[in-house]
Amino acid sequence: MSTILDRIKAYKLEEIAARKAERPLVAVEDAARAAPAPRGFARALSTAAATGYGLIAEIKKASPSKGLIREDFDVPALARAYETGGATCLSVLTDGPSFQGADDFLRQAREAVKLPCLRKDFLYDTYQVAEARALGADCILIIMASVTDSQALELEAAASHWGMDVLVEVHSREELARAEHLKSRLIGINNRNLDTFEVSLDVTRDLARRVPEDRLIVSESGLHTPEDLADLARYGARCFLIGESLMRQADVEAATRAILADPLTAQGGV
């Protein structure tokens, strides 16, 4: 029985083949070389985490498990709201079929703010890495559940070639062990199971203590309140990727500011 991740991989491989046929790699690489210089995604998170929390705020219109998340979807306005609200970096969904994302959303977001941006997509081919840089991405995502070790190494090397950082995402002890063979300092612990889409913060509680001290932990998914962040910080997570719980708020700027507040003084959550 195929999982959601299996289905995503199937259409992504078709999409990659179609894009290669439509736009040769040399053209993508020319665009990547012409793109504005990377802004230092990992550096920004590390600096923020040294004195507080590093927040990767996500621009996400929909998801396979929840359907449409936000109807009022003005990407530049959302990016500015996140920046003003205190986000450290942005994550922008560019996958269309499952998340109603688009390449142009990344361009729009990065042009609207000064924050480093992650291209949030399912990457399997170094062509997509060059594509990410051409779009202005400062960081890419490698999901260990969806790639082989050799693919992960190739994607990471390509990102390094283009001056981008890599967020390596894991959900299990086995995936974490594999991720440790990569050079990237950023380890994303996804609290969402990509096979079932069930969410549990226990994933971060279990894995965070196993992450080498020289890595920077980013807890992802299922984060709704300042208390959630404070709880996971006790396990070593100082950076967080938050999307849906912020995207559902009418006032995204206020919601961003609220979730970063000290839980002892915060008035409720988002």
UniProtKB/Swiss-Prot annotation:
Catalytic activity: 1-(2-carboxyphenylamino)-1-deoxy-D-ribulose 5-phosphate + H(+) = (1S,2R)-1-C-(indol-3-yl)glycerol 3-phosphate + CO2 + H2O
Entry's EC annotation: 4.1.1.48
Pathway terms, separated by semicolons: Amino-acid biosynthesis; L-tryptophan biosynthesis; L-tryptophan from chorismate: step 4/5
GO biological process, one term: L-tryptophan biosynthetic process
Molecular-function annotations in GO: indole-3-glycerol-phosphate synthase activity; phosphoribosylanthranilate isomerase activity
Entry keyword set: Amino-acid biosynthesis, Aromatic amino acid biosynthesis, Decarboxylase, Lyase, Tryptophan biosynthesis
Disulfide bonds: none
InterPro entries: Aldolase_TIM, Indole-3-glycerol_P_synth, Indole-3-glycerol_P_synth_dom, Indole-3-GlycerolPSynthase_CS, RibuloseP-bd_barrel
Pfam (any one): IGPS
Matches recorded under SUPFAM superfamilies: Ribulose-phoshate binding barrel
Keyword Transcription belongs to the record: no
Family of this protein: Belongs to the TrpC family.
HAMAP family cross-referenced by the UniProt entry: IGPS_B (MF_00134_B)
Name of the protein in question: Indole-3-glycerol phosphate synthase
Species assigned in the record: Cereibacter sphaeroides (strain ATCC 17023 / DSM 158 / JCM 6121 / CCUG 31486 / LMG 2827 / NBRC 12203 / NCIMB 8253 / ATH 2.4.1.) (Rhodobacter sphaeroides)
Organism classification: Bacteria, Pseudomonadati, Pseudomonadota, Alphaproteobacteria, Rhodobacterales
